[in-house]
């Protein structure tokens, strides 16, 4: 959430619309949530009573909510409350979608795969745009891909590409670094390798290289990965990443019309 907030501050027109909520216990913030249209609502860790109240607040003004993402118990509390708000949006049903693993790393074991890392530039922009769209389509989150300013959006991303034997073979991005009570954190993502270049270790090589860049700054690296993709999770484990949490995706289904 923090990296998205930084992006919105820097580029207010990056999303169609955006909302942030915080849950407080007195003067203490005990939870937060955000939504950047047209994407899902992200729920952070928070008391279950707070997530139930949030559901009521969201239902009042957001009948186009496509789904939610967050810790399982927080999502469950939100969904139970949302189903009883009586709003148009709440009459949609929800179904469990993808489960993501939250992974962090303390000690990097660099990949031995040959190649070089290069930052996004005019010379590789076309490839980065193509691969960004392909990645979004694969994770079923391609709502931005047809935006008129999509190329400009890609230009603003902190992307790196892996080149082997003169050919671009994989890509990884870095989100904005966020300051937390536990220190600075930078998220790795997206990570994408075209199908024809997979199973050669290029994804692990580029992920390891950008992780090293993060660690050189003194920040801690983290990433989200699809729990249903054993190949990528094996790669991350080999690099030294460890699973510390999970988040669930719940998709909303519009009611049938007569």
Label the predicted regions.
Residues 1, 108-142:
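Short amphipathic alpha-helix that is part of the acyltransferase structural core
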Residues 1-38, 258:
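N-terminal entry module detector
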Residues 1-18, 140-163, 168, 173:
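Active-site rim helix/loop that mediates acceptor-substrate recognition in acyltransferases
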Residues 18, 22, 27-36, 161, ...:
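Conserved beta-strand in the GNAT
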Residues 25-31, 35-114, 250:
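Acyl-donor-binding surface of acyltransferase catalytic domains
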Residues 48-57, 190-195, 199-216, 233-238:
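Conserved acetyl-CoA-binding loop-helix of GNAT-fold acetyltransferases
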Residues 62-72, 184, 214-225:
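Conserved GNAT acetyl-CoA-binding A-motif
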Residues 69-75, 222-233, 237, 250-257:
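Conserved beta-strand-loop-alpha-helix junction that forms the acyl-donor binding cleft
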């Amino acid at each position: 959430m923090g990296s998205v907030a930084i992006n919105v501050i820097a580029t207010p027109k990056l999303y169609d619309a955006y909302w942030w909520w915080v849950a407080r216990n007195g003067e203490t913030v005990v939870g937060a949530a955000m939504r950047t249209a047209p994407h899902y609502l992200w729920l952070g860790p928070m008391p279950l009573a707070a997530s139930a109240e949030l559901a009521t607040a969201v239902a009042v003004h957001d009948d186009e909510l496509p789904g939610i993402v967050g810790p399982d118990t927080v999502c469950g509390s939100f969904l139970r409350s949302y189903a009883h708000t009586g709003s148009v949006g709440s009459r949609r049903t929800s179904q469990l979608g993808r489960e993501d693993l939250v992974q962090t790393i303390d000690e990097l074991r660099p990949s031995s795969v040959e190649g070089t890392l290069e930052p996004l530039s005019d010379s590789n922009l076309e490839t980065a745009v193509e691969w960004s769209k392909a990645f979004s389509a694969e994770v079923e989150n391609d709502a931005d891909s047809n935006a008129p300013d999509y190329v400009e959006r890609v230009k603003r991303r902190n992307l790196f590409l892996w080149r082997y034997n003169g050919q671009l073979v994989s890509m990884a991005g870095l989100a904005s670094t966020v300051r937390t009570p536990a220190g600075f954190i930078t998220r790795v993502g997206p990570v994408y390798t075209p199908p024809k270049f997979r199973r050669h270790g290029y994804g692990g090589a580029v992920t390891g290289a950008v992780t090293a860049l993060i660690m050189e700054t003194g920040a801690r690296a983290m990433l989200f990965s699809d729990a249903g993709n054993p190949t990528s999770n094996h790669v991350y484990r080999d690099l030294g990443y460890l699973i510390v949490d999970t988040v669930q995706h719940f998709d909303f289904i519009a009611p049938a019309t007569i």
